[in-house]
Amino acid sequence: MADQLTVEIIAAIKNLAQSENGGRIPAAIGDITADRQLTSLGIDSLALADVLWDLEQAYGIRIEMNTADAWSNLKNIGDVVEAVRGLIAKEA
């Protein structure tokens, strides 16, 4: 079972994926879990920058990487969750 942070980040990424795909996610994608690759949801580097900005605002953190670095390091939703979790812990 996913923890609250994972659920919230999946919801944020799902909302972004829907907006990137004309308001819906194709049924062929299936369930969105932490293992889901960002590219499989139609999230490109520009959309990833939006996600990172939203997460910074939501959790009061600063993600110290440019979008190119983020794109190479954050391949799936779980990578995003763990990056945010680490930054939240550092801020505490």
UniProtKB/Swiss-Prot annotation:
Post-translational modification: 4'-phosphopantetheine is transferred from CoA to a specific serine of apo-NodF.
Keywords: Nodulation, Phosphopantetheine, Phosphoprotein, Plasmid
Keyword ATP-binding: no
Residue span(s) of domain Carrier: 4-88
Pfam families: PP-binding (PF00550)
Modified residues (O-(pantetheine 4'-phosphoryl)serine): 45
InterPro entries per the UniProt record, alphabetical: ACP-like_sf (IPR036736), PP-bd_ACP (IPR009081), Ppantetheine_attach_site (IPR006162)
Function: Proposed to synthesize nod factor fatty acyl chain. Involved in trans-2,trans-4,trans-6,cis-11-octadecatetraenoic acid biosynthesis.
UniProt-recorded name of the protein: Nodulation protein F
Organism (species): Rhizobium leguminosarum bv. trifolii
